[in-house]
């Protein structure tokens, strides 16, 4: 997707990169706000250009506007803009930006506005929304799930098994000690749905070109190497899309009952009775993760989906009571897997590779992680 003042269409057109699941015939801001998908897009009208990112910036939109020379460029690939000797600015998550083609002034507004009422006492709507989000995104002819021992990929795998799928997952061997998996849980999962294992050899991959696409500090060596290896393997089986649990930090804040387990924890996972105390949520960690995956998959000619930040699912979870949210670590994920008897380790944080109930281990874990990254 590349839209510039030079190739601007003569007719009203909506261009997008990624996936839209509820119709892509978009002609207005109101219709943009109704979109559900993993996408970024540009609506070209006679008098303005309207650009949009989804609520968690599942796809990154880069742009550059020069009001003096009345030029503009929008693209999902930063290299398009770099080749013009321009800097690729990134549009924030959950944002609609309008460029007036008469005045060349820009205005911004939020895409999704969350309903912060916490009224639901069960996870019924959350589970229904999770099933729908995963089902609408899953394409067995193109997709593979990035499998770990954590809660996030576990929920997706559990749902896919309930839908009757097998042989849908892939995982990589060769993790650094600070990112070690809980091997017993992972082995059970791979055995249940016949997951594939690849050996990741970092010597075979160079993430420098990806970093040069756009400086993204979360493209660490191991994660970048893993994604690159999976993309290469996908091509050998005629597939081209990775499905991940990225974004599920939103549901736990890397904390529990007010204890912060990571420096990017906002409120220690202690959800208040009034969500206005913690909203707007700090989503930098989510954006970094999705951004890292997007750059790697884009570079390798593949794609990436994040069903756990589907806006309908997120909204359903927001509407659950604060007591449910505070019932345990990533409690809706826990409850979903427990209901379907899917393997998981209770209170296990894949990102910290340990049991969140053992608070004395976290100082050491955090030190190791900081030293690694």
What are the residue ranges of the model-derived segments?
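Short, charged low-complexity linker/loop segments at the C-terminal edge of domains
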Residues: 104-105, 343-345
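Cytosolic regulatory/linker segments at or just downstream of nucleotide-handling modules
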Residues: 348-350
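ATP-dependent adenylate-handling active sites, centered on carboxylate activation for C-N bond formation
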Residues: 114-344, 356-368
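Acidic, carboxylate-rich catalytic segments that either coordinate divalent cations
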Residues: 373
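Cysteine-centered catalytic environments shared across enzyme families
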Residues: 1-199, 203-204
């Amino acid at each position: 997707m590349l839209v510039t003042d030079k190739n601007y269409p003569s007719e009203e057109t909506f261009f997008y990169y990624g996936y839209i699941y509820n119709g892509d015939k978009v002609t207005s801001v109101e219709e943009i706000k109704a979109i559900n998908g993993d996408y970024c897009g540009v609506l070209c009208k006679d008098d303005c250009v309207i650009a949009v990112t989804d609520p968690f910036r599942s796809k990154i939109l880069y742009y550059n506007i020069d009001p003096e020379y009345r030029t503009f460029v929008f693209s999902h690939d930063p290299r398009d803009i770099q080749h013009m000797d321009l800097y690729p600015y990134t549009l924030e998550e959950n944002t609609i930006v309008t460029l007036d083609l008469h005045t060349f002034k820009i205005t911004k507004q939020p895409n999704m506005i969350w309903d912060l009422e916490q009224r639901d006492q069960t996870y019924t709507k959350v589970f229904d929304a999770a099933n729908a989000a995963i089902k609408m995104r899953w394409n067995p002819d193109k997709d593979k799930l990035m499998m770990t021992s954590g809660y996030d990929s576990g929920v997706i795998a559990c749902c896919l098994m309930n839908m009757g799928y097998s042989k849908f997952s892939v995982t990589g061997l060769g993790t650094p000690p600070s990112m070690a998996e809980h091997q017993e849980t992972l082995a059970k999962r791979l055995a249940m749905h016949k997951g594939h294992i690849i050996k990741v050899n970092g010597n075979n991959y160079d993430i420098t070109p990806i970093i040069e696409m756009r400086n993204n500090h979360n493209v660490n060596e191991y994660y970048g190497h893993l994604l690159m290896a999976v993309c290469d393997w996908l091509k050998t089986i005629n597939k081209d899309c990775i499905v991940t649990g990225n974004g599920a930090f939103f549901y736990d804040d890397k904390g529990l009952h007010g204890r912060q387990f990571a420096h990017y924890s906002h409120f220690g996972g202690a959800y208040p009775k009034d969500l206005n105390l913690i909203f707007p949520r700090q989503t930098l960690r989510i954006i970094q993760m999705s951004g890292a995956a997007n750059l790697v998959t884009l570079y390798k000619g593949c794609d990436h989906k994040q069903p756990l930040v589907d806006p309908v699912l997120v909204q359903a979870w927001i509407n659950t009571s604060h007591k449910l949210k505070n019932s345990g670590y990533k409690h809706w994920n826990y409850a979903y897997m427990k209901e379907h008897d899917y393997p998981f380790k209770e209170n296990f944080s894949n990102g910290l590779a340990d049991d969140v109930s053992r608070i004395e281990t976290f100082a050491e874990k955090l030190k190791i992680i900081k030293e690694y990254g």
